[in-house]
Amino acid sequence: MILPGLAAIIAIGGGLYYYFAVNKLPGSSVEPQTAMSCDMGISAARGRTAGQTAAGGPMRSDQPGELSAPPRLNPSTAPGRAPDGMAWIPGGEFWMGADEFPDAQPWHRVYVDGFWMDKSEVTNEQFEKFAKATGYVTIAERTPRAEDFPGAPPENLVAGSVVFSPPDHPVKLNDHFQWWSYINGANWRHPEGPKSHIKGRGNYPVVHIAFEDAVTYAKWAGKRLPTEAEFEFAQRGGLDRKLYAWGDEFKPGGRIMANTFQGHFPDRNTVEDGYAAAAPVGSFPPNNYGLYDMAGNVWEWTSDWYRPDYYQKLVTQGTLARNPQGPADSHDPSEPGVKKKVHKGGSFLCTDQYCARYIAGGRGKGEPDTGTNHLGFRLVRDQR
């Protein structure tokens, strides 16, 4: 959990994370203790020609560009009428991974059974209904307990969350604290802080949701979080080995397909897509499975623990990965001992200039007890 005066892991715009001490008031400056940056911009990926890796060399024999895909296993058919707001995702086999990020390599074959998936991210209206019915209080709304944070000054044990707070001038991209602030009173009811509200934003994705919050909602709704493999299979919509959920062109025919950041990150958003932050769900075209915002808008929780070497371990098993549930434990070399879950889909802060993990196969990561104003979720249901 992120608190003023404590070290924290924050999800940044491109789905990467950095470690810093949140010990200043919003708007102040502090140097991060360590930082991670993107390994490759999406512009380089777009410039890649067929038959090349991200580095520009020939495809390896274990990469999809040189292989004809094996026949798909017979996809399952929809078992009856769709639950309200859900779409049927047919089971099948696909290529999972991406060239652009080391933790999304190598490409590997995965099979998932069919399942139902929410067409859209869970909205403020839906989450409010749950909160009223159950009295549930999210992690961001709870006052931290001193025994859970020994050594923290009492004045810093204040409920709140992390909010994107862009500077009014260009800044170097190696100090992410320049555009993130811990805001007392920020939570799903007050996305930008205590003076903000969700009135009139019922159809926007609920944010500032920690993993526990999402799981509790899922149990109430009779659903569950998707696995990372299920999310990516659904995200691709049957378009195997494509760069985006809709194909290989970022703006096919000049059409904007997802809510991402345009302009100069982080200080100047030209809002070419019409939204400076999260957009109402369903504001952009659905994918081939009828799912909205599977790329951009807000990051989404999955049930998998995060390990950057997980894909390699699947490949070394030498068999098709069937319904993978993720690794048994979490490990991030940049933060040994800090458990993290996988995020998928990217957000409204993803940008060509800075990072681009809204591409199909991109991965994010985050501590289970931490939410931000660009992190939400959607749910799935097993066939019955």
What are the residue ranges of the model-derived segments?
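Short, compositionally biased
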Residues: M1-K195, E212, V342-G346, E367, ...
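Functional-site microenvironments in short loops/helix caps that host divalent-cation chemistry
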Residues: P58, D62, W88-I89, W95, ...
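Active-site beta-strand/loop architecture of penicillin-binding DD-peptidases
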Residues: H374
